[in-house]
Amino acid sequence: MPKIDITELTQNEVLNLSGHDRGLAARARFNLAHLDEDGEPVEISFPEGFRQVSSSFFQGMFADSVRSLGSVQGFFAHYRFDAPAHIRSKLADYAEQVLGRRDY
């Protein structure tokens, strides 16, 4: 199973990820377009004590993946997040937003 360690982005210096452009850069860095097409699940791990992923960062890094995989369930079956519960909950909300299934 391919693995993405978010510490590669944070360098253990920050506990938040924000910004659409940073999300796009992370998408390119980890070659998510290729991983989206690969049938093998991908584990994404967050550092201990991580606090927040902004919706703009999620949009940049994962919006194309959510659309490509066709559903929130498909996205989370393919990308498996090893993250605190509050982060996983936010990511689920953001994925729903990508597909326009929530009113905000």
Question: Model segments located where?
Answer:
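Extended, compositionally biased accessory segments flanking or bridging domains
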Residues: 2-6
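Amphipathic alpha-helical interaction surfaces in cytosolic regulatory modules
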Residues: 9-32, 37-40, 46-92
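Primarily interfacial, aromatic-capped hydrophobic alpha-helices that serve as membrane anchors
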Residues: 87-103
